[in-house]
Structures are given as structure tokens and as C-alpha cells.
Amino acid sequence: MPDAVGRELPRDGTVLAFDYGEKKIGVALGNFITREARALTILPNITVEGRFEAVAALIQEWNPVQLIVGMPVNPEGGEQPSMKLARRFGNQLNGRFGLPVEWVDERYTSRAASMAGARRGELDAEAARIILQQYFDQFPL
């Protein structure tokens, strides 16, 4: 099953998705077989070293074949300042862990997470879940 630019996507395996924020990073987990995402955790984003130590622990635990990063796009579809940070985070994930990274438009995911009933302390992980579910839904089997 090819992605938007014709690359072959994995057909099985675990996927981790990230909702990158300057203070917190929401994380979700899913797999290509069930194509269902679930909120996993929220990582503090205080230092670069701490951020990637926490991500490394998740990668070691879940052994993903693909990483997804939410791309913050403004309502009109244009770039906003946090987009550059999310793109850099995704590129660093690829460089540090050698795993393929895909970006998903994360417009309104925090609002959707709130409307879905996620509590305040769980919003970032729920937003990551929505990002990952959008990714799965974008490429039906």
C-alpha cells in the first residue's frame, strides 16, 4: 500500500505517533493489523536529552516500524511557527532512531480531543491518538 508520494508503507507492526508541543509531547500507539490507535502517555518536553531518552525508552518497549508526527497547520492550511519545531522533531526522530517518519495534519486535534471528553491532563495523548487514527484512516487496506 503506497503513501501519498508512492512509498510502500509497512503492512504490519507497531506505530508510535507524537503530538509535539514545546512543553509536552503526547504519544499514541497503534498497529497496522488492527488499524486502531490508543492514547499512550505524555512526555515532558523540558530538555532535548530528556525528551529523546523518553522516546528511546518507548521505542525500545514497543519496537515500532513507523513513527508519525502531527504537523500543526493553521485553519487556512498555511504554516504556523510551531510547524518548524514539529518538523525538526520528526527529522531528529528519523536521524536518531533510523525509523521512517510521516507527518499528518493535526488541525483541530486538541479541540477534538477535548470534545471527545479527554481530561485536561490527557489532552496531548488523546490528540496523538487522533493524529494516528487519521493516518490509519487515510490509507485503507
UniProtKB/Swiss-Prot annotation:
Keywords: Cytoplasm, Hydrolase, Nuclease, Ribosome biogenesis. It comes from the Bacteria. Its EC number is 3.1.-.-. GO terms for biological process: rRNA 5'-end processing. It is found in: Cytoplasm. One of its GO terms (molecular function) is nuclease activity. Pfam families: RuvX. Could be a nuclease involved in processing of the 5'-end of pre-16S rRNA. Belongs to the YqgF nuclease family. This is Putative pre-16S rRNA nuclease. It comes from Cupriavidus necator (strain ATCC 17699 / DSM 428 / KCTC 22496 / NCIMB 10442 / H16 / Stanier 337) (Ralstonia eutropha).
